[in-house]
């Protein structure tokens, strides 16, 4: 494994991005590919940085809060099939944009490129996305973005996740034929890790940390995604025009009939 160089500034960024950073434990992978599950807390980012340097840490993962305190809602999408780096990043940007449209900017804390072949979208702590939300609640919400076997544009409801993926495809693949839209929507549909989203006991990669598989540090892409949305939809985020993400009253058995926006069920 290649040696990665953490700086105090990098660890400060990690520290500031982690809620309850001094009240939760961490898991560390060393440059020798050994996991350390530290049974301790860190009071400051300086303490965390010192530990990382002393133990030659590569990857940093955040654990749930102790005593069943829960964990953030995180969408973890990973793309195993891609042609090249450009194709991978296109899939990442389309998938992450679909979730931004689905959950809306007001509910998204940050979107991180993982440093390898996917993205993590962290949701904000709200009444809809409580850190203490039980697993069955998360499983129910996960069903909204399970990939269907096939799509028919005539039966996709505004506000559904399928609609959001389709709009994201339109945004990033502007010169496609409408006849290819359903196939492209399925092609770019993000593959979400069910265990990470639903299992409150799973650890998650710390924002801005190093990813030994991709040999890169993770980076925040939220601004890039929002800038693209606002450039193409000038009213996005201000109540103006843009992709429809309001709740509709669907008629079974249309696709998306159980997939409304965060303003109603998520």
Swiss-Prot record:
Listed GO MF terms: DNA binding; DNA-directed RNA polymerase activity
Bias type Polar residues, positions: 257-266
InterPro entries: DNA_primase_LEF1
The UniProt record lists the keyword Iron-sulfur: no
Function recorded in the entry: Plays an essential role in viral DNA replication. May generates single-stranded DNA for both leading and lagging strand synthesis. The primase initiates primer synthesis and thereby produces large amount of short RNA primers on the lagging strand that the polymerase elongates using dNTPs.
Family: Belongs to the baculoviridae LEF-1 family.
Name of this chain's protein: DNA primase
């Amino acid at each position: 494994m290649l040696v990665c160089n953490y700086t105090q500034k990098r660890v400060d960024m990690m520290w500031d991005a982690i809620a309850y950073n001094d009240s939760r434990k961490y898991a560390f992978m060393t440059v020798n590919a050994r996991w350390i599950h530290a049974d301790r807390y860190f009071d400051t980012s300086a303490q965390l940085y010192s530990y990382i340097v002393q133990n030659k840490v590569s990857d940093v993962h955040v654990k749930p809060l102790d005593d069943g305190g829960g964990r953030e809602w995180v969408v973890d999408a990973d793309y195993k099939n891609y042609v090249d780096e450009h194709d991978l990043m296109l899939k990442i940007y389309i998938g992450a944009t679909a979730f931004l449209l689905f959950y809306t900017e007001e509910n998204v804390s940050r979107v991180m490129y993982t440093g390898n072949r996917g993205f993590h979208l962290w949701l904000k702590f709200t009444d809809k996305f409580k850190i203490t939300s039980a697993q069955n609640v998360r499983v129910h919400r996960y069903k909204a973005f399970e990939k269907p076997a096939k799509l028919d544009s005539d039966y996709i409801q505004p506000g559904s996740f399928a609609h959001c993926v389709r709009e994201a495809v339109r945004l990033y693949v502007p010169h496609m034929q409408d006849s290819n839209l359903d196939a492209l929507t399925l092609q770019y549909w993000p593959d979400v890790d069910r265990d990470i989203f639903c299992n409150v006991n799973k650890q998650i990669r710390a924002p801005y940390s190093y990813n030994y598989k991709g040999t890169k540090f993770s980076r925040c892409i939220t601004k890039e995604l929002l800038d693209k949305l606002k450039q193409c939809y000038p009213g996005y985020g201000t109540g103006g025009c843009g992709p429809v993400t309001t709740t509709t009253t669907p008629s079974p058995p249309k696709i998306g009939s159980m997939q409304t926006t965060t303003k109603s069920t998520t």
